[in-house]
A protein has these predicted regions:
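H-loop/switch region of ABC-family ATPase nucleotide-binding domains
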Residues: 7-8
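Charged, flexible cofactor/metal-binding loops and thiol motifs
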Residues: 34-138
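Short, glycine/charged-rich "phosphate-handling" switch motifs in NTP-dependent
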Residues: 19, 31
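Catalytic metal- and UDP-sugar-binding loop of GT-A-like glycosyltransferases, i.e.
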Residues: 23
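Long, low-complexity, intrinsically disordered segments
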Residues: 140-145
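A short, surface-exposed alpha-helical micro-motif characterized by mixed small hydrophobic
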Residues: 13-15
Length: 145
């Protein structure tokens, strides 16, 4: 049995899905097995979505990634990478002029980004730690309740 569940809340999706597809303006930015999407989040948009997972403690520092810039119209998508107008890791002309390639990691994750995979891994190592911490904090809160 399969079903389509659409949400910006990747934490909820983690309980429901074995495979996650992250879309931006209707285009696939990242997809793969759920655990691969989370550990670490490779695409900058996935990283931003995961950073927005609320913490049970309202006083805790969240480290949210704020996406700046205007959200483009899906009817008039920007050239190049659809996420380039809001990407916190914007590289310049290559992002504006060229569609990003799809790259596949050893664990089956597919990412559309101009940043080379080895650099994405390096950039995301801190994100992965933050996401694991955030998710384990929420899981421990649920157990305590």
């Amino acid at each position: 049995v399969s079903y389509l569940f659409i949400s910006h809340d990747l934490e909820v999706i983690s309980y429901l899905a074995d495979w996650i597809v992250v879309l931006y303006l209707g285009e696939i930015m990242e997809q793969g097995p759920t655990e691969s999407v989370y550990e670490p989040p490779m695409h900058p948009y996935t990283e931003a979505l995961l950073s927005a997972i609320p913490l049970p403690d309202p006083q805790a520092k969240t480290g949210d990634i704020r996406l700046e810039g205007d959200v483009p119209s899906p009817r008039n998508k920007p050239s190049g990478c659809p996420f380039h107008t809001r990407c916190p890791r914007f590289l310049g002309d290559i992002c504006v002029d060229e569609e990003p390639p799809t790259r596949t990691t050893d664990n089956g994750l597919q990412i559309r980004c101009h940043i080379p995979l080895d650099e994405l891994v390096e950039l995301q190592s801190d994100s992965a730690t933050a996401v694991r911490s955030r998710l384990s904090d929420e899981s421990s809160q649920e157990v305590q309740e």
